[in-house]
């Protein structure tokens, strides 16, 4: 399998969450996941109601969430398939080529960057954009998304 190094900024549009409500201000409910700086539970700190969240603060799903800081979670990523609420401890990456299979694959690659970040060094927007991703390529110099999909569906890559 041939790979090429891409930077996050070449694959994703990076978006900062717009949310300003803290955990205590959120109304408990089942409408939206509140995605925070944690790796466990796919980054979901709690479920909340949409009742006091402006619609402009709700992030679209089908996103890679980059955890910038947190209790040992800085440098991790999660894939969020559905709309969610988040605040400034994370940054979101969007791509029209992203789907659930590619999201899982990219999270597994991106999480290898965890070793570079901690309480002393957060994964800020600039560092996120410059983060390198080794991705499979075919004859054209862009990621081979069909191969990524088949690896996730088929459970791996076999060079026969």
What name fits each language-model region?
Residues 1-42, 138-160:
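Non-catalytic DNA-recognition/assembly elements of restriction-modification systems
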Residues 3, 29-32, 61, 82, ...:
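Sequence-level motif detector for i,i+2 pairs with an aromatic at +2
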Residues 9, 67, 134-136:
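A structural detector for beta-sheet-dominated domains
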Residues 47-109:
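A short beta-sheet element
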Residues 53, 108-115, 150-153:
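Short, intrinsically disordered, mixed-charge
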Residues 89, 107-138:
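Glycine-anchored helix-breaking recognition loops at helix->coil/strand junctions
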Residues 95-98, 135-139:
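A generic structural motif
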